[in-house]
């Protein structure tokens, strides 16, 4: 027997285009596409479909950050309530909290000073803090003259998550 009789690919290549078309039709009929648990599979093989990155609104982020300041871990009913109130899924809230805890622990491991990990603040981290230029991301707080005490919750990041009533309170500058 010749090799082309055993290989359907060679056989369709050597035969007429009509035979190749028939072969193509056969494979299309045999292919099955299954989407299950976020995975797409052709004939049992395939890769996971990545869900698009969730974009949170500023209101959602404010509520999530505020809740994270209260507690780093949510019980199931708390998570369900928070998700429902923000129009998010419980999974989105769960993943956000996981990511936030991870980021928080990473910052603590780096010495609780987030400026050390910021390349724009590299030289400032080595010297005492001076009231030179405010960090780029702190424009709103510095424009309002709000200053956070250095030993507040989440050192160096508290002003990112301040609630609206905190912005109206003036705090004495700590030197």
Curated annotation (Swiss-Prot):
One of its GO terms (molecular function) is RNA polymerase II cis-regulatory region sequence-specific DNA binding. Gene3D superfamilies: Homeodomain-like. Residues 1-32, 109-131 are annotated as: Disordered. Its main location: nucleus. Pfam families: Homeodomain (PF00046). This is Homeobox protein DLX-6. It comes from Homo sapiens (Human). It comes from the Eukaryota.
């Amino acid at each position: 027997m010749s090799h082309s009789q055993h290989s359907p690919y060679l056989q369709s290549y050597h035969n007429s285009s009509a035979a190749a078309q028939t072969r193509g039709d056969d494979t299309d009929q045999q292919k099955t596409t299954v989407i299950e648990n976020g995975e797409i599979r052709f004939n049992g093989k395939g890769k996971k479909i990545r869900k698009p990155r969730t974009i949170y609104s500023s209101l959602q982020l404010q509520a999530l950050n505020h809740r994270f300041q209260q507690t780093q871990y949510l019980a199931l009913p708390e998570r369900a309530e928070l998700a429902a109130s923000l129009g998010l899924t419980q999974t989105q809230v769960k993943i956000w909290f996981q990511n936030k805890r991870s980021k928080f622990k990473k910052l603590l491991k780096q010495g609780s000073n987030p400026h050390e990990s910021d390349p724009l603040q590299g030289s400032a981290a080595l010297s005492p803090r001076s009231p030179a230029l405010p960090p780029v991301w702190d424009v709103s707080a510095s424009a309002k003259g709000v200053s956070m005490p250095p030993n507040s919750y989440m050192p160096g990041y508290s002003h990112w998550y301040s609630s609206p009533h905190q912005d109206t309170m003036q705090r004495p500058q700590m030197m």
